[in-house]
Amino acid sequence: MTPHLMKLLGLSAALLAISQGVRAEDVKAPTFSAEPCCQLCPEAHDASRYTTRYQQNFTTLVQAQGDWLFRTREDLRTEFNTTPAGYKRLQQVHDAFKKRGVELVVVYQPTRGLVNRNMLNPAEKAAFDYQKALGNYQAMLKRFASMGYNVPDLSPLTNEQLAAADQGKDFYFRGDQHWTPYGAERAAKIVADTVHKMPAFEGIPRKEFETRKSGRMGKTGTLHNVAGQLCGTSYAVQYMDQFATEPKGASGGDDLFGDSGNAQITLVGTSHSGKNYNFSGFLEQYIGADVLNVAFPGGGLEGSMIQYLGSEEFQKNPPKILIWEFSPLYRLDQETIWRQILGLLDDGCDDRPALMSASTTLKPGKNELMVNGKGGVIKDLINRNLQMDVKFEDPSVKVLQATLWYLNGRHEDIKLEKPETSDTDGRFVFQMREDEDWASQRLLAFEVQGPESGTQKVEAKLCKRNNFAVPAQTAQAGQ
């Protein structure tokens, strides 16, 4: 409370006393006590208290300067890598896009610890091995590049120390994992430099864009929210400038029906690419070309990628350049993600013969959809050669739960979930499992879990797939 406000309150109390017949000199000025706001409680330092799936993304919170919070597992990580299987899949994805004539740009965000470590308190700052983290982050960028990806180096944005005039324009929010619009802009400038050097950019039509402030947004941070759940505290809303980008010379909604539908650069990514941060707008401004943004909030690592690859837009008009933005918090060895992405890049079972197929109405419980040998002949259906294409009549279906049975009695339970925020078409495409010794398994049957109540129409096809070869030396990267 400011001294000025305290004086006003004291004067008000005195006037009230006078009106009640009491002498002002007998009235004491009000007293106030101020406690430090929002220091984390002991529970926030106990990983076992992070019980929900959502809370476990924030294990464990660390109080920093002011309202700044950090996560020890994600923000203060020093390791940036994946498993040999993850590197192999990344190579396959690159090669699959290359076959489609698409060049990939990987925007691998630096962590909040790398960028805003100067906001840590002295003890935590000393404990965080910044040099190790930075070295490993840069090594991961080189690994992406060694596989053929175009990789903007965002490491110059680390160890941020803003000038006095730029205070409040931090790269990341104080209590949220997202970058601010100012952070998005700084990243976009570096990404644009990388795009300009790509041969694929040479034939892309140029266009001038300009960006203006469009208002202010209030950010209730996700880290602050979790701290509130654990400690019962609340943090102040952080207000930040918002921006909008439009073609130079345009006004209002002039570009609503412009040629952005013919963009030859597409952005897929996480909620960092959402409208609030204007990352796609800054990309348009600094690249100097239309960018189609298909990212959506809550999409995670793969949500917008899978939705886009299954779209008519990608199938008929694949971009020359695909910018893929994601953060190090996502594991890059999640087999079910790569199986879906590679299956969609191979067009599922569109326009190719089905080795097995079925169309039926599902009932609650397990439904036997396809059986190898039902016609009297058992086919040699080996996992490494196959992919599955499942289509529900109801496009709003976002979960496929199924069981794949094999001739030797083994089975795989698979569950594919699309984000609640995604615009789905009811289609699920995935390659058959090939990690460990699954590649040589021979398929016997395919069961699908039906709805909780009522019925659900579905059709499924099993077909041969293309194999995207991986050079042996690249598949071993990171070992």
Curated annotation (Swiss-Prot):
One of its GO terms (molecular function) is acyltransferase activity. Pathway: Glycan biosynthesis; alginate biosynthesis. Residues 24-349 are annotated as: SGNH hydrolase-like domain. Residues 350-476 are annotated as: CBM domain. The active site is at 176, 178 (proton acceptor), 271 (nucleophile). InterPro entries: ALGX/ALGJ_SGNH-like (IPR031811), AlgX_C (IPR031798), AlgX_C_sf (IPR038639), AlgX_N (IPR034655). Pfam families: ALGX, CBM_26. It comes from the Bacteria. It is found in: Periplasm. GO terms for cellular component: periplasmic space. Keywords: Acyltransferase, Alginate biosynthesis, Disulfide bond, Periplasm, Signal, Transferase. Its EC number is 2.3.1.-. Gene3D superfamilies: C-terminal carbohydrate-binding module. One of its GO terms (biological process) is alginic acid biosynthetic process. Residues 1-24 form the signal peptide. Disulfide bonds join 41-231, 349-463. Monomer. Consists of two domains, with an N-terminal domain with structural homology to members of the SGNH (GDSL) hydrolase superfamily and a C-terminal carbohydrate-binding module (CBM) that may bind alginate. Belongs to the AlgX family. This is Alginate biosynthesis protein AlgX.
